[in-house]
Curated annotation (Swiss-Prot):
PANTHER family with a match to the protein in the record: 50S RIBOSOMAL PROTEIN L32, LARGE RIBOSOMAL SUBUNIT PROTEIN BL32
Protein's recorded name: Large ribosomal subunit protein bL32
Disordered: region residues: 1-28
Organism this protein belongs to: Pseudomonas syringae pv. tomato (strain ATCC BAA-871 / DC3000)
Name of encoding gene: rpmF
Residues in coiled coil: none
Length: 60
C-alpha cells in the first residue's frame, strides 16, 4: 500500500476536493404537455421538442 512521504495540509486536501461537489440535473418543461424531463431527452410520454417521436403503445 502506498504511504505518503509528507503530510498533505488541510488546504491542499480541500483544494483537491473542490471539484468533487455534485451538481443538480438540469430539467426542462415540455412545452406541449408540460411534463418535466432531462434536457435533450425524450419526455416519459414520448414527446421531444413538441413532436411525438415515440409511439407509447408500441412499446407495451
Amino acid at each position: 500500500m502506498a504511504v505518503q512521504q509528507n503530510k498533505k495540509s488541510r488546504s491542499a486536501r480541500d483544494m483537491r476536493r473542490s471539484h468533487d461537489a455534485l451538481e443538480a440535473s438540469t430539467l426542462s418543461v415540455e412545452k406541449t404537455t408540460g411534463e418535466i424531463h432531462l434536457r435533450h431527452h425524450v419526455s416519459p410520454e414520448g414527446v421531444y421538442r413538441g413532436r411525438k417521436v415515440i409511439d407509447k403503445g408500441a412499446d407495451e
